Every structure is written in C-alpha cells, then in structure tokens.
From Swiss-Prot:
UniProt cross-references to InterPro entries, sorted A to Z: Ribosomal_uS14
Name this polypeptide is given: Small ribosomal subunit protein uS14
Assigned GO CC terms: cytoplasm; small ribosomal subunit
Subunit and interaction comment: Part of the 30S ribosomal subunit. Contacts proteins S3 and S10.
Pfam family, one: Ribosomal_S14
Function in brief: Binds 16S rRNA, required for the assembly of 30S particles and may also be responsible for determining the conformation of the 16S rRNA at the A site.
Lineage: Bacteria, Pseudomonadati, Pseudomonadota, Gammaproteobacteria, Oceanospirillales
Organism name: Carsonella ruddii
Length: 95
C-alpha cells in the first residue's frame, strides 16, 4: 500500500491544478497590465503542487510502476483480476 503522505500529495496536486488552469484562462483574457500580477501568482506556486508532479497509482495496491491508465491498475492486478474474468474484454491468452 502507498504511504498516506504520497496519496495526500496527489490529492493536493489535483485540487490545485484546477486553480492553476483558471489563472491561465483569466490571464489570456486580460490586458497586459494585469497579466504581470497573474504571472507572479503562477510563479509563486510551489513546485510540489504542479500537475506535472502527479504520479499515477494503482487504486488497489498503490503501486506506481507498470501502471495501466485504461484500467487504473498495475500489471500484476490486471493479470490476477483478468484471469478470473472480472475485467470485460480481457481473456487469458493461450497459443
């Protein structure tokens, strides 16, 4: 299972990404005089809160490696759950 602090960090990033997006949209609509203040606000945002730092995690195990976006699971769990037939469209292959 993933550490609670890492899960909280991902939640914080997602929460603040909406704010950052709104600031950028407003920046494009305003005049140049006001955009400088908005640029300062964007630069003052801590790097930990940026969306590029977001790490995809498996919902069940919390594992970050071998993560499949389509299922939001890692490869080990896809194999286990897929063999039982709980994921639609996945079958055990044999040739």
């Amino acid at each position: 299972m993933a550490k609670k602090s890492l899960i909280q960090k991902n939640k914080l990033i997602f929460k603040n990404s909406k704010k950052n997006f709104k600031i950028i949209i407003i920046k494009n609509k305003l005049k140049k005089k006001f955009t400088f203040n908005l640029l300062l606000k964007i630069q003052s945002i801590k790097k930990k809160k940026l969306k590029t730092k977001f790490i995809n995690r498996c919902y069940i195990s919390g594992r970050t490696r071998s993560f499949y976006n389509r299922f939001s699971l890692n490869r080990n769990l896809i194999r286990k759950i897929g063999n039982f037939g709980y994921i639609t469209g996945i079958e055990k292959s044999s040739w």
